[in-house]
């Protein structure tokens, strides 16, 4: 299944919900472009990975690029609801420490409220 992206504002965070696969080509490029467009407009982006079936090296690259772009703009890019395969890939590649991870989108939103207090 190709990647579909849905962007919305929830609380004080911008959420990008991903469904499908984040792979080399149009999918990874679309996610990178979406993150780059949102970063100057917000302080926090959460990428909801609950609908992601597969991610490859290019997909990981898009996520890492998003984190680096965000850091340069005093913004954060965080991951919510990564499945077991994504978590295993992040651990295997030693990239797990690069990302702020939340088990669910709700947990990310609650964390956002805690930061605002």
Which sequence ranges carry the predicted segments?
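Non-catalytic signal-transmission and effector/linker regions of two-component phosphorelay proteins
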Residues: 1-9, 113-117
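Conserved catalytic submotifs in the C-terminal HATPase_c
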Residues: 10-11, 50, 82, 106
């Amino acid at each position: 299944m190709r990647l579909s992206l849905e962007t919305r504002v929830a609380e004080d965070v911008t959420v990008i919900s991903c469904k499908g696969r984040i792979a080399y080509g149009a999918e990874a490029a679309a996610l990178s472009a979406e993150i780059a467009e949102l970063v100057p407009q917000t302080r926090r982006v959460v990428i909801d990975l609950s609908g992601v079936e597969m991610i490859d090296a290019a997909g990981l690259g898009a996520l890492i690029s998003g984190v680096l772009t965000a850091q340069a703009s005093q913004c954060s890019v965080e991951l919510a609801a990564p499945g077991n395969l994504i978590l295993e890939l992040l651990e295997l590649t030693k990239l797990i420490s690069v990302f702020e991870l939340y088990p669910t989108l709700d947990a990310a939103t609650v964390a956002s409220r805690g930061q605002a207090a």
